[in-house]
Every structure is written in structure tokens, then in C-alpha cells.
């Protein structure tokens, strides 16, 4: 093709950014009364996590994915400040703070989550997780994809010592 005859591409109206986040926590002893909270949902018959907060690894992984787009650190900075000054341990509040860090011209369009752990059992609550995460993030449940694996005993998570979560999200950014 002759470079002199090339037509310049129009400036795109939308650019897409990808965020990635991870979090993991070890379970407390079985005798603990702290609830096991994942994606804002309580999972019965499983102890809570060793964490200063409620230990919600799904919300934490989403926060970290948003931070990778906005460069505003929520966990370890904003969350610690909320804990120390106001005693807030609810990871849903941390996620709300992460969402506020998005620019007005940015919108999350898709969230993909994968969880590894032999317990609790996730399959029966996948729909409730999608619904709750979508509600907190002002998305539709079809914008949330969740997969879970037991790990089959190959890692500490697969052996039942804790749970690990990865999140990849797509952010659409409008450009003038």
C-alpha cells in the first residue's frame, strides 16, 4: 500500500483498559465465630478468614483490579485508614471507595473472577454471588463471570487452608 494514499484512522471514542487483581486469606480455626464472607455473601459451615477486615477475598481482588487501572491504592491505604479511624471492616465499603476512584469518563463493562479453594462449596452460590457483586458495582449479573476450582489438593488453597481469588476487569474510557 502506498503510504501517501493512506487515510488516517479516526480517533477512537472509547479506549479499553484491563485491570487485574488478586487476594488470598487463610482460614481462622474451626472454633472461630467470625463468618466466612465472599462477594458480600455469608457462607455457612466454614470459618472466617485471618484478616483485619472481614477478609472478603472476592471484593479485595476486585479492589486490586480497579487499583491497577486507577493507580489509587485502596487496600493497604484507604482501607487501613477506614479501619483505624472508623473501625470499618466491611470490604463492601472498600469496594465502594475503589469504584469512586474511577474517573467520570470510565465505566467497568465486565468483571471476570476465578476462585480457588476446596471449601466452601461455591457452585450453589454462584448465582447469588453474581447478583450481589453486580448490585454493589451497579452492573448487571451478565457483566459478572465467575469460575471456581477446588484446586484438587495441589496448593494450600486446594488443601483447604484458605481461599484465593483473581479478578480481571474491563474498563471503557470515553475520549473526546
Swiss-Prot record:
Binding site residues for 4-CDP-2-C-methyl-D-erythritol 2-phosphate: 23-25, 149-152
Enzyme class: lyase
Highest taxon in the source lineage: Bacteria
Enzymatic reactions: 4-CDP-2-C-methyl-D-erythritol 2-phosphate = 2-C-methyl-D-erythritol 2,4-cyclic diphosphate + CMP
Stored PROSITE patterns: ISPF
Residues marked Transition state stabilizer (site): 52, 150
Keywords, in A-Z order: Isoprene biosynthesis, Lyase, Metal-binding
Binding note for cofactor: Binds 1 divalent metal cation per subunit.
Cofactor dependency: a divalent metal cation
Entry annotated with the keyword Lyase: yes
Pfam families: YgbB (PF02542)
UniProt: a divalent metal cation binding residues: 23, 25, 60
GO BP annotations listed: isopentenyl diphosphate biosynthetic process, methylerythritol 4-phosphate pathway; terpenoid biosynthetic process
EC number of the protein: 4.6.1.12
Annotated metabolic or biological route of this protein: Isoprenoid biosynthesis; isopentenyl diphosphate biosynthesis via DXP pathway; isopentenyl diphosphate from 1-deoxy-D-xylulose 5-phosphate: step 4/6
MF GO annotations: 2-C-methyl-D-erythritol 2,4-cyclodiphosphate synthase activity; metal ion binding
HAMAP family linked to this entry: IspF
Physiological role: Involved in the biosynthesis of isopentenyl diphosphate (IPP) and dimethylallyl diphosphate (DMAPP), two major building blocks of isoprenoid compounds. Catalyzes the conversion of 4-diphosphocytidyl-2-C-methyl-D-erythritol 2-phosphate (CDP-ME2P) to 2-C-methyl-D-erythritol 2,4-cyclodiphosphate (ME-CPP) with a corresponding release of cytidine 5-monophosphate (CMP).
Subunit annotation: Homotrimer.
NCBIfam families for the chain: ispF
Family: Belongs to the IspF family.
Protein name: 2-C-methyl-D-erythritol 2,4-cyclodiphosphate synthase
Organism: Chlamydia pneumoniae (Chlamydophila pneumoniae)
Taxon lineage: Bacteria, Pseudomonadati, Chlamydiota, Chlamydiia, Chlamydiales
Gene of this entry: ispF
